[in-house]
């Protein structure tokens, strides 16, 4: 009967508009929900089957809710470093629990990017869903996204990130060495010619200074030693001979063979003088050390002569440890180092003007006590050479190498491997002291890459800058998420460490997803399966840090929908009342 179908059509209109009202109400209620996607009710006709000759029967209307999940919401700035929004396609991957995840655990997808740290340090949004991503390798620190393997995703946790320290591996020095720096006495040889006096200053045990004239003579030897060159030696102070003797050199090796010094008022002493022959021709010799008595002639007095610079026995490192020993450097550069534990060490580059106009002796040393096997802290020694225009002869090198000098300090407790004879056991390399308990450290010292590098000009010796990497120990102060989805830990020593990368899931039909509690969605047959991607890769949207995606609800549109829905509902109710009145009239016929 057509009247009955009209009444049923009115009922369907009430139902459809009730559904539309529900969708509008849901939209209005979530106008401030982060990442909420509005929905609407679409109406479609219902047709009663029949032919054209039959009386028309109303079919009514059907409402179907449609979600605009793929619609982009406006981006709103926030003050939280953990707030993120997606600009473009994709969803955050989340789980309901943070740990012990398996492939069968349900994954939810959301655009709600307001995350906070829970009590265990996991990133969780306001709905209690845990953010998933690719974690950094604990050893290398590298993050390698693998979109093909769901189990590579894990809940992002920053609670396990402790303090950090990075050891120094590179050093750049910018300094100038004075080109007219006088050659130190410990470097210059005291040269004398046979028959001519050579001045030698010595200090006795009572710190009395004596100035001796040493005269060599190649004549007057009655019984010269076969194969050797012998010289008579006269040692005078203030014109008075205090000792006489002779020295003999091997003609082939130029090494001192023997020396006999006759002190006035004392018995002769054999082998108490050390000299070095400079010229193999036999006319020029050098007196480096004198083991002689003081001017009074007392044979039990101790006299110490000035020694020549020798990095292995009489070095600048020795002087740094004990000022009464070794050779005082002409210039030093302090280089700060961070060890593997974040401890702050200092390596000193000491330099001594060499005998050549463009030559300097150099030593690298640690603080005495920082090394286990070198009491004076010496690490490395060598020579620095410059060109005539004041540049390093070998660009970037320290000791004449063609590349930046590398020093290696072995770890605390290092034990050198033994070799099998006849192989010779190499010297033990510099090693950190056992008490420090720190790792091996290799440091590249570059003297050219730093601005200006190391130069030798006729101006004051000065350090312009020393640049190093590495940091002291630092505590975690902040967490940030950048445009690439990298979650980074920031420490108070200036170090930033990436700990994870946020994963983005995309769908071929995101509007086919099924909504669940917490402003999240689940996979359906209509949506298709998801594809994991890094932000801004493969069609995935980019992340916007410190922002949130606003709800896509437009209140003006929703209120307009309320009016039309209310009118439609009222009109549908009129259909029912009208049909009812017509049926009433039909019943009145019988009266």
Curated annotation (Swiss-Prot):
Signal peptide: none annotated. One of its GO terms (biological process) is bacterial-type flagellum-dependent swarming motility. Transmembrane segments: none annotated. GO terms for cellular component: bacterial-type flagellum basal body; bacterial-type flagellum hook; cytosol. InterPro entries: Flag_bb_rod_N (IPR001444), Flagellar_basal_body_rod (IPR053592), Flagellar_basal_body_rod_CS (IPR019776), Flagellar_FlgE/F/G (IPR020013), Flg_bb/hook_C_dom (IPR010930), FlgE/F/G-like (IPR037925), FlgE_D2 (IPR011491), FlgE_third (IPR055069). Belongs to the flagella basal body rod proteins family. PANTHER family: FLAGELLAR HOOK PROTEIN FLGE (PTHR30435:SF1), FLAGELLAR PROTEIN (PTHR30435). This is Flagellar hook protein FlgE.
